Amino acid sequence: KRLLEDLGIKINEIIPEGASVKNLINLPQAWFNIVPYREVGLMTASFLQKDFGMPYILTTPMGIIDTADFIRQVQKNVNKLAPFFLKKTFDFESYIDYQTKFV
């Protein structure tokens, strides 16, 4: 959650964390989904991709390499729609470099 906020990404919904059936109506508003735990959410993400064309990210941002890969996947998915809706693209490489500089 904090990582996405650091990148300036607005979180649409966190399911199942504190969510109810009423929150499900907001799911199609997301540009992509994140499935940090395959045991919880993979079936839903697969359904949303199949029926609504909504991509998902399976990489869990733990450790330097997986976190960098996760951020690059977020960037790829954001940049599919950002030029149309926000009239710009995003480059998170400087964030990755800064976060890994002293490790």
Curated annotation (Swiss-Prot):
It catalyses: chlorophyllide a + oxidized 2[4Fe-4S]-[ferredoxin] + 2 ADP + 2 phosphate = protochlorophyllide a + reduced 2[4Fe-4S]-[ferredoxin] + 2 ATP + 2 H2O. The keyword Iron-sulfur applies. Binds 1 [4Fe-4S] cluster per heterodimer. The cluster is bound at the heterodimer interface by residues from both subunits. Its cofactor is [4Fe-4S] cluster. GO terms for cellular component: chloroplast. Transmembrane segments: none annotated. GO terms for molecular function: 4 iron, 4 sulfur cluster binding; ATP binding; metal ion binding; oxidoreductase activity. Pfam families: Oxidored_nitro (PF00148). Its main location: plastid. Its EC number is 1.3.7.7. Pathway: Porphyrin-containing compound metabolism; chlorophyll biosynthesis (light-independent). It is an enzyme of class 1 (oxidoreductase). GO terms for biological process: light-independent chlorophyll biosynthetic process; photosynthesis. It comes from the Eukaryota. Keywords: 4Fe-4S, ATP-binding, Chlorophyll biosynthesis, Chloroplast, Iron, Iron-sulfur, Metal-binding, Nucleotide-binding, Oxidoreductase, Photosynthesis, Plastid. It is found in: Plastid, Chloroplast. Protochlorophyllide reductase is composed of three subunits; ChlL, ChlN and ChlB. Forms a heterotetramer of two ChlB and two ChlN subunits. Belongs to the ChlB/BchB/BchZ family. Component of the dark-operative protochlorophyllide reductase (DPOR) that uses Mg-ATP and reduced ferredoxin to reduce ring D of protochlorophyllide (Pchlide) to form chlorophyllide a (Chlide). This reaction is light-independent. The NB-protein (ChlN-ChlB) is the catalytic component of the complex. This is Light-independent protochlorophyllide reductase subunit B. It comes from Equisetum scirpoides. The gene is chlB.
